[in-house]
């Protein structure tokens, strides 16, 4: 098991940067969501980039199975420690499949997949994805994602992820949903929400005439305080088109608001996750400054759709560039 104490921090130097040995062209994730025992199946389509072994980051993951090109691997074919999974001998192209078990309820770091209030949420910037599954968890590895998830339909009826929704429903007491993001993205922009939420919905017509479905997802009782947030989102989308010619590139854009989200707001592709402080506002309870903060933060995170999400950083010395550009 890749577990144990948080490893001591070591200095990271720009001069030490090396390109990844393997790139991930596509990743398929399948989640069986349970608060204390979530199972994550991952299927990575890999392509060699430079010489060297395949090293995947992973922390606090219980490895259940591993297969390479359909062949189950014995423990003599890989090495596993508290921070990584390494395969020393790899073909230049391969499909790697792993299954792991994680404990979102015990994840008090609020990094990776964790429980909060009404459900499951994620925060993967900067290195949270490695607490979900084994992966080259670095921003210069960009992949297309296909996500399936199942959860208790009574407790977690709403299942959200990046990209466009392909399917959803209820089967044998389990809610299920399937999402696909057609645009390559780094792992730090992965997002998942499974919770009992309600949505304020609207739509936006892009400059080319496409209809985009908009949703602001909040806890029950908070939906009356979302009008300003929805208006701010639509104004941001229009401004980005008019000023920079940047049209939104998916069919759906969602915001999910979490009361104890520890990052303020996060620009995950197609599924922004916010602290409620930057979403909820009405004339009875909010000041002018509150309204301005909602407008400012929603605009900033939406603008990351191009400067940060589609065009991202190579390493963690570069985010200041796209953040200031945004």
What kind of feature is each model-predicted range?
Residues 24-30, 81-86, 129-133, 161-163:
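Short structured motifs
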Residues 26-28, 37-43, 51-53, 93-97, ...:
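Intrinsic-disorder/low-complexity, polar/charged segments enriched in Ser/Thr/Lys/Arg/Asp/Glu/Gln
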Residues 1-39, 114-119, 123, 135, ...:
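N-terminal, polar/Ser/Thr-rich
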Residues 302-317:
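Catalytic Zn2+-binding segment of zinc metalloproteases
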Residues 124-127, 135-299, 315, 322-325:
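Hydrophobic helix-coil surface modules that form long, contiguous segments used
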Residues 45-60, 148-150:
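Surface-exposed beta-strand/loop patches in extracellular or lumenal glycoproteins
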């Amino acid at each position: 098991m890749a577990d144990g104490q948080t490893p001591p921090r070591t200095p990271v130097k720009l001069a030490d940067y090396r390109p990844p040995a393997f790139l991930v062209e596509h990743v398929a994730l399948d989640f069986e969501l349970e608060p204390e025992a979530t199972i994550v199946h991952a299927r990575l389509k890999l392509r060699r980039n430079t010489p060297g072994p395949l090293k995947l980051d992973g922390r606090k993951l219980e490895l259940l199975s591993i297969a390479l090109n359909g062949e189950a691997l014995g423990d003599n074919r890989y090495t596993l420690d508290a921070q990584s999974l390494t395969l020393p001998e790899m073909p230049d192209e391969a499909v790697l499949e792993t299954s792991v078990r994680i404990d979102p309820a015990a994840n008090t770091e609020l990094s990776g997949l964790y429980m909060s209030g009404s459900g499951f949420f994620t925060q993967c910037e900067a290195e949270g994805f490695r607490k979900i599954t084994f992966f080259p968890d670095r921003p210069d590895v960009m992949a297309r994602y296909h996500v399936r998830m199942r959860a208790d339909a009574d407790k977690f009826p709403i299942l959200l992820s990046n990209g466009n929704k392909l399917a959803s429903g209820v089967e044998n007491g389990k809610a299920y949903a399937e999402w696909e993001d057609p645009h390559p993205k780094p792992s730090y922009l992965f997002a998942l929400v499974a919770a009992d939420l309600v949505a304020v919905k609207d739509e936006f017509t892009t400059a080319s005439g496409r209809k985009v479905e908009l949703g602001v997802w909040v806890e029950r009782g908070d939906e009356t305080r979302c009008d300003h947030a929805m208006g701010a989102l639509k104004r941001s989308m229009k401004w980005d088109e008019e000023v920079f010619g940047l049209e939104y590139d998916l069919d759906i854009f969602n915001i999910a608001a979490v009361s104890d989200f520890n990052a303020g707001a996060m620009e995950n592709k197609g599924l922004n996750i916010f602290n409620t402080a930057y979403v909820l506002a009405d004339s009875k309870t909010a000041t002018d400054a509150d309204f301005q903060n909602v407008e400012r933060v929603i605009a900033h995170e939406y603008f990351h759709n191009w400067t940060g999400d589609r065009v991202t950083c190579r390493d963690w010395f570069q985010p200041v560039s796209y953040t200031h550009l945004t």
